[in-house]
């Protein structure tokens, strides 16, 4: 155990976050997401909701400042509905952890899947909210 590291972060997830470079993306996927059929680098975070993962990850993670929206979520399929509180819950978790909320946009379902295939890794969470997936784009970490 490391001091100052959120207990929701597994050693595998910490290693992955450290390996990622600027411009790399990571998918925080809900429990329904077809992670293993879309990606070879899948990390399990069973039982942990995405808002908790966001609270744990974002203090360690610089958001990409060179894109309009470093956060991407999945749009509901036409005729289906999604709970707007999911997005609010995620943005509140980020705000709570880092003091601001980066821009967020949404992608159609299959565009989201295509983008997820290109990500550095997919983290399968215990999130059960429908359309509860989010992609985070890593930025350049400032040198202090």
From Swiss-Prot:
Return the InterPro entries for the record. Answer: L-fucose_mutarotase (IPR023751), RbsD-like_sf (IPR023750), RbsD/FucU_mutarotase (IPR050443), RbsD_FucU (IPR007721)
A GO biological process of this protein is:
fucosylation
**Entry's EC annotation:** 5.1.3.29
- Pathway(s) per entry: Carbohydrate metabolism; L-fucose metabolism
Question: Which keywords fit this entry according to its UniProt record?
Answer: Carbohydrate metabolism, Cytoplasm, Fucose metabolism, Isomerase
| Active site: residue positions | 22
Q: What class of enzyme is it?
A: isomerase
Coiled coil (UniProt feature): none
Where does this polypeptide localize? Cytoplasm
* Entry GO MF terms: fucose binding; L-fucose mutarotase activity
Its main localization is cytoplasm
Which GO cellular component terms, listed alphabetically, does the Swiss-Prot or TrEMBL entry include? cytoplasm
Binding, substrate: 30, 109, 131-133
Query: What domain of life does the UniProt record list for this protein's source?
Result: Bacteria
**Catalysis: reaction(s):** alpha-L-fucose = beta-L-fucose
Q: Which family does it belong to?
A: Belongs to the RbsD / FucU family. FucU mutarotase subfamily.
Biological role stated in the UniProt entry: Involved in the anomeric conversion of L-fucose.
Instruction: Describe the protein's quaternary organization and the partners it interacts with.
Output: Homodecamer.
The protein, known as: L-fucose mutarotase
Originating species: Haemophilus influenzae (strain 86-028NP)
């Amino acid at each position: 155990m490391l001091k100052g590291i959120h207990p929701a972060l597994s050693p595998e997830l910490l290693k992955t976050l450290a390996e990622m470079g600027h411009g790399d993306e990571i998918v925080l996927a809900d429990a329904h997401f077809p992670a293993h059929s879309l990606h070879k680098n899948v990390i399990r975070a069973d039982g942990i909701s995405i808002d908790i993962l966001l609270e744990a990850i974002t203090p360690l993670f610089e958001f990409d400042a060179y894109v309009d929206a470093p956060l991407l979520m999945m749009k509901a399929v036409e005729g289906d509905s999604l709970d707007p509180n999911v997005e609010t819950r995620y943005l509140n978790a980020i705000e709570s952890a880092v003091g601001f909320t980066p821009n967020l946009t949404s992608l159609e379902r299959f565009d989201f899947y295509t983008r997820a295939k290109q990500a550095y890794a997919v983290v399968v969470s215990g999130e059960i909210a429908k359309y509860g997936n989010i992609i985070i784009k890593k930025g350049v970490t400032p040198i202090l």
